[in-house]
Amino acid sequence: MPRAKPMPKLPAEAYAIIEGRHADPFHYLGLHPEGGKSVVRAFLPEASNVEAVGEHGEVARLDRVHDAGLFVGALPNGSKHYQLRAKFGDSIVEFEDAYRFPPILTDFDLYLLGEGTHQRLYDKLGAHPMTLDGVDGIGFVVLAPNARRVSVVGDFNFWDSRRHPMRVRGSGYWELFIPHAKRGDHYKFDIVGPHGHQLPLKSDPMAFASEVRPKTASIVFDEAHLPRPRPAPDGINALSAPMSIYEVHLGSWRRKGDNEWLTYRELAEQLPAYARDMGFTHLEFLPVSEHPFDGSWGYQPTGLYAPTSRFGTPEDFAALVDACHREGVGVLLDWVPGHFPDDPHGLGSFDGTSLYEHANPLQGRHLDWGTLIYNYGRTEVTNFLVSNALFWLERYAIDGLRVDAVASMLYLDYSRPPGAWIPNQYGGRENIEAIAFLRRFNTELFARFPQATTAAEESTAWPQVSRPVEFGGLGFGYKWNMGWMHDTLNYISKDPIHRKHHHGEILFGLHYAFSENFILPLSHDEVVHGKRSILGRMPGDEWQRFANLRAYYSFMFGHPGKKLLFMGAEIAQSREWNHDQSLDWHLLEYKYHSGIQALIRDLNRLYRAVPALHQMDCDQAGFEWLITDDANRNVFAWLRKGLDEHARCLVIVNFSPNVYRNYRVRVPFAGKWKEVLNSDSAHYGGSNVGNIGEVHAVDGKTPELRLTIPPLAAIFLVPES
């Protein structure tokens, strides 16, 4: 019996390929001119026979030189293009060799990536359909500078990490073009860490689509050809424009009869029209980036570039944005650049080291949330985040971003006990690198999208959050006014008889109301974790609770600052928000609840129609106190002013259950003043006490109105031109 031909001795590079530790498989695999021939090497572990088919039909048999599946042969000298023909079991397959194609990243790309200034990472990193040398396929690029080996695994290679090891380029970016991989293919990255340890399969940080949880594979999607939604109306984010935001969790606004989510397209048929009818100028979505845990509400994302697949495809999400803009409603996204979860398929220990996060848990882990904190000192990380912000505005025509948990980013000792944090280089608690990141984020976003806006959820007294970077600020368009929210909710929760002792909680907010461009937020955070619903905080019997709520909402809309209401506030949701259930829309069958909805609709319309109520929301010159000292009667009065000297609106709020008649308020103009809204109207469920639509200012040295002030109510009056 003839003896088997012995395997030839192989170079060290061959064993590096076989053992999955070669950082540049192109250096060995593929076609290489050697000794007057075109040597072809292929690593196909499951193949029994392999041939190379040249561009002119010439065929070269590749010898199996190692039992692991390494094949070597030669085509005639001068051959450049070829295919591989391999036998797998009983099947013979002819296919392109991934290791014969040119690089994906250019030298200029690598320069910008290394510098951390590439503003369009989404054009280069991730998975992109492309054509190289006339062959269609997918180009994959991922950052893993400390990895020993990175492979792409997916539907196109039976999830075999031996089939498609990538090559590393400058600054630790790994790339590979896989011929005939296609849109819709599922994939992940198989990574061996710097010490040779195998990591869990990683989702693509730049994936544009993902599987529905609990599955975690990334999905190839051609985002460059995504139909871009139409733009929002011009000037929708201007400081002088009305801004009334309806904050929505897409998974629980409405649900189907079987408690299933509405899809993006089903939401597009209902939500934008509802927001427009209710008078809101903007919708703000809780984070839509892919996230593994429903209970995080999206605030622990693993896929920052992928709209969550819970509700449909990226095209479906684009259709929702387009529907909003068609209705004249702007779209804001909650954006989470402060932290991320430590799920094994995510960003944590991505290449076997702390690539995206800090290695030291005193810097890299949130004690409150058990999440990981981005390392803003790495240019690759800040580039990843800034590009993500720009991505949402460019690809999906988003009108602005609200940045979550800014305070946790600004302070190194945020929610940490003494000794559990590391000071900055000056010994302070300020996170200098995070400050630089936020300034860069705002600077680059407004440079690219000057009509957009940003808002910061910042709960401390950090100065100049919404002031320009060039003047020492963080550069945000707006800041959430958390102090106003806490003080006023505390005030309104008191029994009216005790409110005179808390009078200053209403007044205090006006001492700083114009230090920032403020949004007044009644957000999702205020209706969870035992805080009760907004209605649930109101004291008194049923009538008083709803009257208090009507007065409070009216006070909010008359107060300087842009407005934000979380879904359910407009129907006086009785219970706390539950992300696993729809809002209680059946409550609208009851007059008090439908009355609140009618009031919010009319407050929005009034806010938009009366320039004095919005044009100078963020300007001290747009506000004047008229009555601040009537604590015994719980009455406040002020004047709102527009840009035109005759644009005025008088707001009077009575936080007591008493009716006050012949109540005197000085005004700037004599003549007729129209009562344009009364929250005590029977239309809203009130007692219908008021001024029969108008009142005349008594002329004198100072014009004066003598008014009937309804109980637990607010009235708005404007001078008749």
UniProtKB/Swiss-Prot annotation:
Keyword tags: Carbohydrate metabolism, Glycogen biosynthesis, Glycogen metabolism, Glycosyltransferase, Transferase
* Presence of the UniProt keyword Zinc-finger in the record: no
User: What residues form the catalytic site here?
Assistant: 404 (nucleophile), 457 (proton donor)
UniProt GO BP: glycogen biosynthetic process
Extract the SUPFAM superfamilies matched here. (Trans)glycosidases, E set domains, Glycosyl hydrolase domain
What's the catalysed reaction?
A: Transfers a segment of a (1->4)-alpha-D-glucan chain to a primary hydroxy group in a similar glucan chain
Q: What class of enzyme is it?
A: transferase
Q: What is its EC number?
A: 2.4.1.18
**What pathway or pathways are given for this protein in its record?**
Glycan biosynthesis; glycogen biosynthesis
Determine the domain of life of the protein's source.
Bacteria
Q: Which GO terms describe its molecular function?
A: 1,4-alpha-glucan branching enzyme activity; cation binding; hydrolase activity, hydrolyzing O-glycosyl compounds
User: What quaternary arrangement does the UniProt entry report?
Assistant: Monomer.
**What's its job?**
Catalyzes the formation of the alpha-1,6-glucosidic linkages in glycogen by scission of a 1,4-alpha-linked oligosaccharide from growing alpha-1,4-glucan chains and the subsequent attachment of the oligosaccharide to the alpha-1,6 position.
State what protein this is by name: 1,4-alpha-glucan branching enzyme GlgB
Organism in which the protein naturally occurs: Bradyrhizobium diazoefficiens (strain JCM 10833 / BCRC 13528 / IAM 13628 / NBRC 14792 / USDA 110)
Please name the taxonomic classification of the source. Answer: Bacteria, Pseudomonadati, Pseudomonadota, Alphaproteobacteria, Hyphomicrobiales
